[in-house]
Amino acid sequence: MEPAVERKVPEQEEQLQPSHARAEDAPPAAVEEEDEAEAEESERRNRELKAGLHPLRRKLVLWYTRRTPGTRSQSYEDNIKKIVDFSTVESFWVCYCHLARPSSLPSPTDLHLFKEGVRPLWEDPANRNGGKWIIRFKKAVSGRFWEDLVLVLVGDQLDYSDDVCGIVLSCRFNEDILSVWNRNASDHQAVMTLRDSIKRHLKLPHTYLMEYKPHDASLRDNSSYRNTWLRG
């Protein structure tokens, strides 16, 4: 089966540079905040284990965006609606079994599955220094790959998973687009390792074309999927 929309893309130089910044280089207040959040997550998992449930490593939130074509009266942020959150395997399946499949969603529509505390906005503090890997699919096969990507995120299976903020399904008129958002667009090793991990978990060919775009570039050109920087 051919999963992708075939696209001819000119070669570009890789514009990401390796970064040596790590958690230990963060300001003390930021480190303290991360430690508190991790402690809260640990307490939550312990409570759920005692209740006989199967806790996820991170609580996740599902968001929905639907903009009526030709309507510009509302901002993108105003159009984002929270659907549900879940933190256990059991609550995930209850939610997922009732969700509409990509093939039944109108265009343009976006579904966002993000870690709790991170909003699916370029400007969110967790996202503003990051970017996203972009994967384009024919509409006939996108549902399968979206489900696989959801299960990968829920299972915390991606490499550099702490660097991953969330995933997005964008239903468009001629194609569907999946994207994986990460925190640090300047960490070349993390960005490229994440790309390889996505391909491996989705069983995409090694030569399959993916695109990367930093969120600050999206802010400049006000576009999610045009003018991507890195292809590979």
From Swiss-Prot:
GO biological process: regulation of translation; translational initiation
MF (Gene Ontology): RNA 7-methylguanosine cap binding; translation initiation factor activity
Function statement: Recognizes and binds the 7-methylguanosine-containing mRNA cap during an early step in the initiation of protein synthesis and facilitates ribosome binding by inducing the unwinding of the mRNAs secondary structures.
One GO cellular component term noted in the UniProt record for this chain: eukaryotic translation initiation factor 4F complex
Protein name: Eukaryotic translation initiation factor NCBP
Recorded superkingdom: Eukaryota
Assembly description: EIF4F is a multi-subunit complex, the composition of which varies with external and internal environmental conditions. It is composed of at least EIF4A, EIF4E and EIF4G. EIF4E is also known to interact with other partners. In higher plants two isoforms of EIF4F have been identified, named isoform EIF4F and isoform EIF(iso)4F. Isoform EIF4F has subunits p220 and p26, whereas isoform EIF(iso)4F has subunits p82 and p28.
Biased composition (Basic and acidic residues): 1-11
Keywords: Initiation factor, Protein biosynthesis, RNA-binding, Translation regulation
Disordered, as annotated region: 1-49
Entry similarity comment: Belongs to the eukaryotic initiation factor 4E family.
